[in-house]
């Protein structure tokens, strides 16, 4: 298993290995040296489902690692260093995260079958594939207002497409994406952290192009009613927030988190905090870095009054599954999207980049479990009234009951998919049986 040193890459891989722990397969997770220190506190975790191996990305330790430089170095030096790990031990299959097009080439060079663990939506894979393989017409991507019609997806605007496709991302990103599409010729399986019942029409629409195999939701087993296990978080977990949640009323707390990479902006923090105060609702807010919230007076006042908690990191699966949570204000990253689906929590969708805008469309218009929060059309700023509107819509508005009902339906469907005989469980069994064991 090959992943880069990002929480959004590592956690799905580890959970994938955990779900296959019942088999006689042995897993090694190879990741870059940058993850060594981050994972040091959990490296001896007795329940860890994989061995860890680290390889150099070819850059000095103090290099800032801007995306373009990192991508070039991984392709040149990372590939050679990964090959050394592979040569030390015979592997029967290599599973890689997306957007590392050099990994399938390394697998092919060693005559090892390769799978991609797609950690975005099936819908996102469909969009990327149809664009880069030129199977469907697309408008001029310079014009964000142009519409895009694709099978099994709602009518999209260019602004809804994954941002990595857009010309504004630059030539290097577009080259990387084209290389990823090309590397699919060396990929035998496209495994997706989703489940058939969630994206059935999209999955069916890809069956004659590049079949995708849903094997999720890849979440900690306790969310599926099984034994409770720790996740391999790269930030220290703040247990106080769970103790605080235990003291709150059922379905009363607004949970806010914009992921492990995006940093909160002070003006957005103040806007959302003011809306929370006006609504009079308790909140649990993950802000990174935490200092971004320390200068926001209205937020600090509410924390001092015991009306909310601010933490730099919390174990999201446990937070979302807590009975006190009423809704989730989210950036709509796919890991967060899957976790909110499995826990049955309605969302306020506030996407920013990559696949998040498309995930927001899925959450609101396909899954039916949330509303979209938008910046002002004139000045581009988030307004207090808009935040209040969205919180009301998902907690007590006329459509709130339907969202909650639909969220509960998807929660049960997710559990069924991973249960013995379920759609994802069957796909996992088929994948395992298809691996040529030497």
Swiss-Prot record:
Signal peptide: none
Enzyme class label: transferase
Residue ranges of the TM segments: none
Residues the record lists as binding UDP-alpha-D-glucose: 260, 314-316, 331-339, 353-356
Record EC number: 2.4.1.-
Entry keywords, A to Z: Glycosyltransferase, Transferase
CDD domains: GT1_Gtf-like (cd03784)
Pfam family, one: UDPGT
InterPro entries registered for this protein in UniProt: UDP_glucos_trans, UDP_glycos_trans_CS
Gene3D superfamilies: Glycogen Phosphorylase B (3.40.50.2000)
Gene Ontology molecular function: any one: UDP-glucosyltransferase activity
PANTHER family named in the record: GLUCOSYL/GLUCURONOSYL TRANSFERASES (PTHR11926), GLYCOSYLTRANSFERASE-RELATED (PTHR11926:SF1264)
Family that this chain belongs to: Belongs to the UDP-glycosyltransferase family.
The protein's name in its UniProt record: UDP-glycosyltransferase 84B2
């Amino acid at each position: 298993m090959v992943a880069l040193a990002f929480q959004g890459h590592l956690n799905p891989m580890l959970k994938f290995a955990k779900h296959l722990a019942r088999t006689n397969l042995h897993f090694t997770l190879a990741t870059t040296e940058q993850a060594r220190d981050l994972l040091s506190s959990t490296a001896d975790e007795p329940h860890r489902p994989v061995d860890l191996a680290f390889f150099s990305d070819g850059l000095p330790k103090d290099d800032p690692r801007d995306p373009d430089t990192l991508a070039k170095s991984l392709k040149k030096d990372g590939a050679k260093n990964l090959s050394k790990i592979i040569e030390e031990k015979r592997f029967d299959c290599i599973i890689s995260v997306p957007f590392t097009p050099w990994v399938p080439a390394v697998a092919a060079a060693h005559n090892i079958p390769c799978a991609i663990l797609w950690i975005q939506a099936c819908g996102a894979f469909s969009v990327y594939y149809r664009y880069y393989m030129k199977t469907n017409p697309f408008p001029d991507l310079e014009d964000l207002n142009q519409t895009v019609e694709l099978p099994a997806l709602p009518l999209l605007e260019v602004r809804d497409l994954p941002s990595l496709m857009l010309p504004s991302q630059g030539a290097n990103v577009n080259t990387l994406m084209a290389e990823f599409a090309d590397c699919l010729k060396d990929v035998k399986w496209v495994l997706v952290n989703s489940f058939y019942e969630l994206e059935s029409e999209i999955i069916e629409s890809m069956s004659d192009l590049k079949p995708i195999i849903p094997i999720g939701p890849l979440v900690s087993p306790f969310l599926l009613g099984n034994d409770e296990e720790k996740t391999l978080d790269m930030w220290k977990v703040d247990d106080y927030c769970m103790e605080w949640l235990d003291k709150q009323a059922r379905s009363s707390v607004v949970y806010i988190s914009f992921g492990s990479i995006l940093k909160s902006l002070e003006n957005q923090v103040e806007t959302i905090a003011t809306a929370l105060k006006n609504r009079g609702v308790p909140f649990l807010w993950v802000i990174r870095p935490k200092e971004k919230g320390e200068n926001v007076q209205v937020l600090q006042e509410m924390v001092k009054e015991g009306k909310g908690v601010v933490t730099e990191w919390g174990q999201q699966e446990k937070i979302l599954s807590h009975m006190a949570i009423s809704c989730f204000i989210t950036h709509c990253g796919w890991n967060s999207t899957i976790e909110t689906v499995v826990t049955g929590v309605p969302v306020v969708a506030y996407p920013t980049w990559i696949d998040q805008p498309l995930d927001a469309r899925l959450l609101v218009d396909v899954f039916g479990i949330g509303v979209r929060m938008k910046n002002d059309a004139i000045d581009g700023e988030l307004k207090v009234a808009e935040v209040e509107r969205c919180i009301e819509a998902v907690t007590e508005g006329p459509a709130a009951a339907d969202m909650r009902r639909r969220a509960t339906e998807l929660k049960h469907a997710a559990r069924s998919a991973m249960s013995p005989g379920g759609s994802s469980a069957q796909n996992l069994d088929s994948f395992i049986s298809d691996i040529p064991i030497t």
